[in-house]
């Protein structure tokens, strides 16, 4: 029902998945305004004649980014609900909690960001210092994500939308 890959869907010299999928089917979506996770792809791949009764039927394709945090975040936020829907689940909307930020983020990004954070003893959220998509330790340290809208900044004390990782793992 689904072909899921990690890496190879960006624009680098060694990114071969995207052209292969385009040759065997079609991409409906490529690159999204999300950080981490911009090189994300969705499409379909046709099954070949050797697939028996499924021959010619399309199979879903999802290509995750290659950076580990980007792959992790896009899987939780995009692939997990997709899989739940394929399985017939009706309730897939994320439950968020509004909590105060105990950090500042002075730069506004053009993309919607999902920041790795954790709750502290004071009931607020701390930001992992290095939000790079290659720093996998941020996912171990964090207990949730802040859904940070494009073009916005965060001042300490502002309320933000917190998505508990436990919600995404259930």
Where in this protein do the model-derived segments appear?
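Short acidic/histidine-rich motifs immediately flanking catalytic phosphotransfer sites
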Residues: 1
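Short glycine-rich anion-binding loops that position phosphate/pyrophosphate groups of nucleotides
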Residues: 8-14, 66
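Short Gly/Thr/Asp-enriched flexible loops that form oxyanion-binding sites at enzyme active sites
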Residues: 12-24
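Flexible glycine/proline-rich
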Residues: 22-170
């Amino acid at each position: 029902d689904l072909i899921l890959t990690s890496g190879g869907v960006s624009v680098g010299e060694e990114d071969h998945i995207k052209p292969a999928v385009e040759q065997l089917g079609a991409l409906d979506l490529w690159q999204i305004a999300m950080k981490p996770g911009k090189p994300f792809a969705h499409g379909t791949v046709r099954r070949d004649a050797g697939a028996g009764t499924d021959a010619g039927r399309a199979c879903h394709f999802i290509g995750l980014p290659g950076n580990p945090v980007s792959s992790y975040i896009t899987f939780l936020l995009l692939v997990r609900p997709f899989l739940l829907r394929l399985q017939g689940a009706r309730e897939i909307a994320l439950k968020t909690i509004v909590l105060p930020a105990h950090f500042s983020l002075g730069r506004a990004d053009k993309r919607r960001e999902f920041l790795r954070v954790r709750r502290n003893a004071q009931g607020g959220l701390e930001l992992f210092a290095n939000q790079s998509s290659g720093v996998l330790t941020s996912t171990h340290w964090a207990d949730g994500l802040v859904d940070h809208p494009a073009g916005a900044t965060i001042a300490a004390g502002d309320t933000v939308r917190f998505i508990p990782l436990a919600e995404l793992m259930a």
